[in-house]
Amino acid sequence: PKEFDEFCEMYKEIRLPFWMQTRPETINNENIKKLAEVGLHRISFGVEHGNEEFRAKVLDRRWKNKDIIERLKIPHKYGLSFSVNNITGFPTETKKLAFDTIELNRQIDADNANIYTFVPFHGTPLRRMCEDLGLIKPETITKCLVEKSVLNMSQYPAHEIEEIKKCFALYVKFPKNRWKEIERAEKNDKEGNRIYEELKVEYLEKYMPKPDANPHGGLEDFKKVENPNYSIDIPGEARPGSKDDLNYH
């Protein structure tokens, strides 16, 4: 678009590193290359959910997983790191459906994979859906992105949502033969928390970037470090919600 070309032409005189948020379907090789050349160093992608049918029906986002996976290979070509934003606890969702989000993230080479609790903001279609289904009272005011679910869903109660969030990064990165351990680590009891802490230490050792790799480098740094090691969020540590999350509730 004209505005995109005008931005790139203008910003090449500034060249301060910048970060942006978008959706996978908006990018291609040409526009990411141009943005990297004028200072883009990091991207956050709103994927939100990994089940195609659920994503289309509930979120009105009609894109195939295979297309998301292919588009998210593009940033690495230009030395750009990126994160993927996911949400769980949507109305009518189940824990089984949440694992489709885990499966999709396992196929994406992001350096961070975030997951947040769905927040039913007033004035959105999903808020009306929640009220129509009796999952929330009309007078209930939502607060922030990192709080427990405010929805009353018997098929996916708040404690199960917290279990998925707690171990999301572990499920994404560890091989599936470790999933039984991770499942036990979901539980907020003495044994579950002990296993979780052990897995967290192992995760940090295996999947955090090495000192000589700069995951925020951009094109110039990418030429110096051709195979940076990417990681995802430290499990169990909450990150502030992004504006990208807010757009699709």
Model-identified regions with their sequence ranges:
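Conserved SAM/AdoMet-binding glycine-rich loop
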Residues: 1-83, 88
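Ser/Thr-centric signal marking residues that sit
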Residues: 22, 101, 124
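Catalytic cores of alpha/beta
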Residues: 30-35, 91-107
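Conserved, mostly hydrophobic/aromatic
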Residues: 35, 45, 105, 123, ...
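Flexible glycine/acidic-rich beta-alpha junction loops that bind and position SAM and/or redox cofactors
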Residues: 53-58, 88-96, 111-158, 183-190
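Short, hinge-like loop/turn segments at secondary-structure boundaries
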Residues: 61-63, 101-102, 131-134
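Radical SAM enzyme core and accessory elements
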Residues: 139, 143-249
